[in-house]
């Protein structure tokens, strides 16, 4: 039962990566992301990624978007099965970059991620509004800005 579930979960993710590769017009970083990353690097502001994605997907994104230009892939946190919650992942991410969570900015795109960021102690949450829920996001604790693209930062 569990083995079958793992098999189909991995298969689903393989299909996801395949469809991403095939949809070239839509498969790209959010507008302004590269300039934003460049700016963070230039100002020596530490940052990383903490994602619920599995390692295979993280590796795929690092390779596809050349994220290693900005982020050491070894510092990226992903779902390796050891995190009981996204809160723990945020706590580890803050340790990886050496910045206490209350001093971090977390960029999120889901309500559960926003709630976890708040519960982890972050009070500077920026939301990428890919779901057209701006008004809902603006009401959530810790949300300081809702953006459509990184050009809005």
Map each language-model feature to its residues.
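Short, basic/glycine-rich phosphate-binding loops at helix/coil junctions
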Residues: 8-19, 69-75
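Asp-based, Mg2+/Mn2+-dependent phosphohydrolase catalytic module
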Residues: 38, 55, 60-153
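Short helix-coil transition/hinge motifs at the ends and kinks of transmembrane helices
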Residues: 1-2, 21-24, 68
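Conserved phosphate-coupling serine/threonine residues in phosphotransfer and NTP-handling enzymes
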Residues: 51-53
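Short, acidic loop-to-helix structural element flanking the phosphoryl-transfer center
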Residues: 18-49, 59
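Short amphipathic alpha-helix in the helical subdomain of ABC transporter nucleotide-binding domains
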Residues: 1, 5-9, 58
């Amino acid at each position: 039962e569990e083995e079958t579930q793992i098999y189909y979960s991995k298969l689903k993710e393989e299909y996801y990566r395949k469809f991403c590769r095939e949809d070239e017009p839509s498969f790209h970083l959010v507008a302004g992301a590269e300039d934003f990353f460049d700016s963070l690097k230039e100002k020596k502001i530490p940052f990383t990624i903490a994602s619920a994605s599995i390692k295979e997907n993280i590796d795929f994104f690092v390779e596809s978007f050349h994220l290693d230009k900005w982020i050491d892939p070894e510092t990226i946190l992903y779902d390796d099965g050891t995190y009981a919650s996204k809160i723990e992942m945020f706590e580890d991410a803050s340790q990886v970059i050496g910045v206490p969570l209350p001093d971090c900015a977390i960029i999120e795109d889901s309500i559960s991620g926003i709630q976890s960021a708040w519960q982890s102690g972050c009070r500077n949450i920026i939301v990428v509004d890919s779901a057209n829920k701006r008004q809902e996001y603006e009401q959530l604790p810790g949300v300081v800005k809702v953006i459509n693209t990184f050009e809005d930062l």
